[in-house]
């Protein structure tokens, strides 16, 4: 530990890095904090209604496992997994998009006051920042990083919410979210395009995320990855469930928030 920074690979330095890739929800934004508590009960209820003989707790374990495994990918993949589980229990699933819209309706009900408050100015943007986000982004900008935001949340929502949080201008590389044609975009595809079209080398990537996917994608190309194991919404301690998954896919560092960004920079960019 380095204050609240857990260093899993002491020699992981980002001295060659030029590109920073960020996830959105749970990494820099807390607008959707609590989404797991919306998605999981919805799925548990749907599966429990199939009367497979499992207890609610047994079903919850199954749901938590695949929801966690797919965090960071487009939301539709979690709904495809739900459809698979419905079939396994002898049910006939509807289209995954049906379940995605059902989930988004429930989530919007939970977060509508947050969005409205940010939009009318009654809530300050930093209320829904992961602590230390702005100083971290400012520090990376000062180091000449080109920054990209890539999220599993729908494209129109990510762009709107990044703007409401007044974070959009930091991401000069662009803001990318999920598309209806979900196979046409992923974080891995974005990284591949940057390598092929922008001439970015794998070791020039620095990734930040609270989900399995972006950490794995950055590590696969040889970049350095910081696992942001936010215990939402306070984000003062490490969420052990997130930590285990992030460490499991090769995160170099684990942090609960960005408040120790200067210490993190000393580790990433030793002089």
Question: Model segments located where?
Answer:
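Substrate-recognition element of Asp-dependent hydrolases with the DxDx(T/V) motif
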Residues: 27, 39, 122-129, 133-163, ...
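A metal-dependent, Asp-based hydrolase signature
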Residues: 65-142, 146
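Acidic, Mg2+-coordinating phosphoryl-transfer loop and its flanking beta/alpha structural elements
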Residues: 151, 207-253
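Conserved Lys-Pro-Asp/Glu-containing loop-to-beta segment of HAD-superfamily phosphomonoesterases
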Residues: 185-218
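Glycine-rich phosphate-binding loop signature in dinucleotide/nucleotide-binding domains
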Residues: 142-145, 197-203, 268
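A short, structured active-site edge motif that brings together acidic residues
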Residues: 97-98, 168-184
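Short acidic-hydrophobic, aromatic-tinged amphipathic segments that line or gate anion-handling sites
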Residues: 176, 252-260
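Active-site neighborhood of HAD-like aspartate-dependent phosphohydrolases
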Residues: 2-61
